[in-house]
Amino acid sequence: MALPLQRWHIAPPQPDLVAEISASTGLSPMLAQVLINRGMDTKERSQIFLDPDREPLIDPKSEFPDLISSLDILELAVKNQLKIAICGDYDADGMTSTALLLRTLRLLGVEVSYEIPSRMHEGYGINIRMVEELEARGVSLIITVDNGISAYAAIACARELGLSVIITDHHDLPEQLPPANAILNPKLINPDSPYYAIAGVGVAYILALELADRFGKRPNLESLLLELFTLGTIADLAQLTGINRRLVKQGLRLLGRSQLPGVTALIQASGIADDQKIGLKPEAIGFSLGPRINAVGRIGDPVTVIELLTADDMGKAITLAQECEATNRTRQDLCSQIEREAIAYIQSLNLNLNNERVLVVIQPNWHHGVIGIVASRLVERYGVPVFIGTTEESEEDNGEQNSSIRGSVRSIPEFNVFEALQFCREYLGKYGGHPAAGGFSMPSSNLQGFSDRLREFAHKHLELHHLKPLISVDVKADLQDISLTLLEQIDLLHPCGMGNSDPVFYTDNVRVISQQVRGKNKACLALELDRGNGSKIKAIAWRWGEYCPIPDRVDLAYKLRANKWQDKTSVELELVGIRTTWTPIFESKPAPETKNSAIWQNLKSLETILQPALIYGYDHPEVGFDSDRPIPHKLYKSLILWSLPPSITHLHWLINLTKPEIIYLGDQIPILPTTLELKQKLTKYIEQTSINLADKVNLLDLGQKLWVAPCVIVAALRELGNSCADFPPTKSLNTELKNQKHWYQISIERLMSILQH
């Protein structure tokens, strides 16, 4: 039965530290392990994480070098009633940033306007056309939000025309900074600063709040600005760490009873449950409000969202929220249609993704505003980086037709999108991005060269075991331990999101009682699972309908969610990972401890060896002795260990089967595989055993073939996402391989001591 392509990485358990963190926080041991996985590995860190308000707040003026000068420029503009323009962007971060500064400057009595570039015709960021039009309208000061740091030409043009410019942005820095009057960007401050991970709306929030403070208007604005900060930060998938975590935690409490008519109307239009209105959860923004805002930026007019978020009239807000809702439904339909077409196209190519290692999917008539979403879904489905694009036709001034490609990229952890685009830059027009995502454009005639170059990059950076979506798992759980109490404790870890993901639990060998597909296009898989105590628990898997039916026994990775029905609340599992139950175990019982009284000697020469003899070891010479495997029931006077076997268990077997009088120890040291090589070999082995439906692995035999101990194999399997639940805890694969190397270098004296004890 086909299951989703996946590889699991299970965080190594740390029982001693878990006990300490659990005792100091009152959290269950499972959630203490989650805190440790998030880097909260001391009592102090974990307590601040759970209550971020207890840590003193650092003044942003001491962190951002240009913040005071930015405030001076703005104060002068406000007092002199200069015209100000905000240059925003068409994503959620840019639109909420624009709305945030608009509200602030309007409250201060400033004549302020805003400009958003055309997604369809101009692309991201401030441009010269915008600057020239603003100068013609008498604007004196431009503030960019969520853009500007890479717009050298546009900023230089503004300065030449006599305009002042304040850049507020959070994107990576170019080689040469633009000549703005002031630049606020967290990439210019200390990476250890709590402000380092703020999004564009975070920079705008700091500037607006400090400006309101100068004019004594902070009490009038603080709550409103915090709502917009929270909305933009989560919708932009910013890291929920540092100051973001502290402020978002506060902002979520405000959003449920928002003072902003636009937010209230959007909550109503999206159908968020009434019980969340006492305090929204991040997923309400990430899966309900954020998509409706972003949909407008993708395929509609961003003015709709900015007017919604700055509306003071509820009637107007409801009308605008309904427009957002309608646009989002159109966006959903477009995504589904393009996804179906993309999958059909990929299947028609009959590609071997192990050879390709990257997907390039270019088709005409796709809306480039939504292809990034489709790219993410294709990565989830195929487990490789996806470059998706659509062709666009235009006419040159001389009447000739010009064909170009405009695309988006989504990736996997081991493939850096920006570096890949740089590697292919000779074929590209414009490009940009970061390690996980990006965008590009190029002439259609460059497609073949671009694709070939991409495959070259992919083969340099991706190994076969990378070509499956990665599921990061926090901790093992028994289904009997899943409860409302645990779910309530998870709330203490909120807000969850980027940098602090929802806890992912896993349970081995779960029995599936029933399964069925549900929802639109039967896309969801609904399960009933045996909890092992005579009770059941429900599970839902979004977009897994095509995998029904799944096996009766599976390992599951999941998040927890509340299921409310008829005033009753229960816990159900939201599945994120599934695999066939496969646990490596010994096929044979370990050998008994060695009672042999053989004499140990360092091997000096093979010429004086007492026979019959068995020679064993890595890369041993062929010298006429029995070799490698002893003949059953044959007694040997000599056992020649050209090298040690992979483990003490292997050594026990050899000695007990040969019962030698003398054991000669050579100094040969096997060449060990690297962590990467071992994972590759085991990945291939797993695929072969899965095909043969094998559920047992002879670790001794496999260890002999690879010249590593069983604990090394299990450590590698665990890093590949296999739980190996019946095997004792292991250290990291890197540590186990170091220990393996030390084993092969052990002295006779130390070895005899180990055997005796």
Task: Give residue ranges: language-model regions.
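A short acidic, amphipathic alpha-helical/loop segment
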Residues: 153-157, 359, 374, 489, ...
